[in-house]
């Protein structure tokens, strides 16, 4: 196996720390060709679709991509902004705000973002961080709840990249933060702010992205972590069990997924006499196709056509101040022990050590 070419090693330089915020991904444009490229990468991941590769290849290449790409492109076009894909726009802004927040707290930390599928890709950003001298990297998935279909796939991408690197940086990974106090508090503030403006609903629906039910029986903790998030948020909102419901959306294919499904549940609520619902998607930290189009357009239509009168979608955390603060606290927790905050005296001491190392290396014949 061949290895990637390493940048020249520089003596006397201080190692840097970086946080890599990773989201799912998005097409580069709301066009059939761009969506086809994106779906091909996404649905080719064995973490996402656990079907024998040969069988799945024919299904993907001959059925799904030819017929689904155009339909999905129209949906992306409905939510595309002048800045681009909402998911990419929000994730990029979160990374910039997190940089500022950590810097204001005294951390010397660089924050970059990447997409598991699409661009900027995980390998692309990891190469960039290496070229800039980052020797400590915290991988922070944008998924509060862990799943082998999402979080683990990010870890796979990182491991796969470094399997061909000679000089591997120190790595840390955030597995989940579904029950982190600051994350729950950010959700609470978002919901309360909406209620202050629009009033309370008859029912709060917490809709999480679905996964095949078999993943639960095979040991994936995602279902349990979603319910724990919902329970903790309901407690902070002083909701009783009959005032909220947990559902799962975005079912793909014919296999059974985690239930209850979001759209049928909303239809059932409307037919049972529930007039107003608020829908929140706690597992999505950035608004995207699944929230803006699936929930904001399709599920809204289903609820109203079934007899409901008032449907409100509560936006994702996006660039919410409380969420950026939560991200910072989660990152700080996982960077404990890394020298990201140095006093002037300690910084000067480290710089002096670096100068001594450089001088000694040059004495031994090093060029840089």
From Swiss-Prot:
Name the pathway it acts in. Answer: Porphyrin-containing compound metabolism; protoheme biosynthesis; protoheme from protoporphyrin-IX: step 1/1
Q: What is its EC number?
A: 4.98.1.1
Alphabetical list of Pfam families matching this protein: Ferrochelatase
Q: Which UniProt keywords apply?
A: Cytoplasm, Heme biosynthesis, Iron, Lyase, Metal-binding, Porphyrin biosynthesis
Q: Name one GO cellular component term.
A: cytoplasm
Cited Gene3D superfamilies:
3.40.50.1400
* Record-listed Fe cation binding positions: 209, 290
Against InterPro entries, the record matches this protein to:
Ferrochelatase, Ferrochelatase_AS, Ferrochelatase_C, Ferrochelatase_N
Q: Which reaction does it catalyse?
A: heme b + 2 H(+) = protoporphyrin IX + Fe(2+)
Q: Tell me where it mainly resides.
A: cytoplasm
Record PROSITE patterns: FERROCHELATASE (PS00534)
GO MF terms on file? ferrochelatase activity; metal ion binding
Q: Where in the cell is it found?
A: Cytoplasm
Any one GO BP annotation for this protein: heme biosynthetic process
Top enzyme category: lyase
On the tree of life, the source organism's domain of life is Bacteria
Q: Record keywords: DNA-binding included?
A: no
Q: What does this protein do?
A: Catalyzes the ferrous insertion into protoporphyrin IX.
Similarity comment text for this entry? Belongs to the ferrochelatase family.
Record-linked PANTHER family: FERROCHELATASE (PTHR11108), FERROCHELATASE, MITOCHONDRIAL (PTHR11108:SF1)
Q: What is this protein called?
A: Ferrochelatase
Write down the species.
Herminiimonas arsenicoxydans
């Amino acid at each position: 196996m061949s290895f990637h070419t390493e940048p020249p090693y520089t003596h006397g330089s201080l190692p840097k720390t970086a946080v890599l915020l990773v989201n799912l991904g998005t097409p580069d444009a709301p066009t059939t060709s761009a969506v086809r490229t994106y779906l091909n990468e996404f649905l080719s991941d064995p973490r996402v679709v656990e079907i024998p590769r040969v069988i799945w290849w024919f299904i993907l290449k001959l059925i799904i991509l030819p017929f689904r790409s155009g339909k999905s492109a129209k949906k992306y076009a409905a939510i595309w902004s002048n800045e681009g894909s909402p998911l990419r726009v929000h994730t990029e802004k979160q990374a910039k705000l997190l940089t500022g927040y950590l810097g204001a707290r005294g951390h010397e930390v660089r924050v970059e973002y990447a997409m598991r599928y699409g661009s900027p890709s995980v390998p692309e950003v990891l190469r960039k961080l290496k070229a800039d001298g980052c020797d400590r990297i915290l991988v922070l998935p944008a998924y509060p709840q862990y799943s082998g279909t999402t979080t683990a796939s990010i870890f796979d991408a990182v491991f796969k990249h470094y399997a061909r690197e000679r000089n591997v940086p120190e790595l840390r990974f955030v597995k989940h933060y579904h029950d982190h106090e600051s994350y729950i508090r950010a959700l609470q503030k978002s919901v309360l702010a909406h209620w202050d403006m629009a009033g309370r609903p008859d029912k709060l629906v917490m809709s999480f992205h679905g996964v095949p039910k078999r993943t639960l029986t095979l040991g994936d903790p995602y279902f349990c972590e979603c319910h724990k998030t919902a329970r903790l948020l309901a407690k902070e909102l002083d909701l009783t069990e009959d005032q909220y419901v947990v559902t799962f959306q975005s079912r793909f294919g014919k296999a059974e997924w985690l239930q209850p499904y979001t759209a049928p549940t909303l239809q059932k609520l409307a037919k049972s006499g529930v007039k107003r619902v608020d829908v929140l998607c706690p597992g999505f930290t950035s608004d995207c196709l699944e929230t803006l189009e699936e929930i904001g357009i399709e599920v809204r239509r289903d609820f109203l056509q079934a007899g409901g009168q008032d449907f409100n979608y509560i936006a994702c955390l996006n660039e919410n101040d409380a969420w950026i603060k939560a991200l910072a606290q989660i990152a700080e927790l996982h960077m404990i022990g890394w020298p990201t905050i140095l006093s002037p005296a300690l910084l000067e001491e480290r710089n002096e050590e670096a100068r001594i190392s450089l001088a000694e290396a040059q004495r031994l014949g090093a060029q840089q």
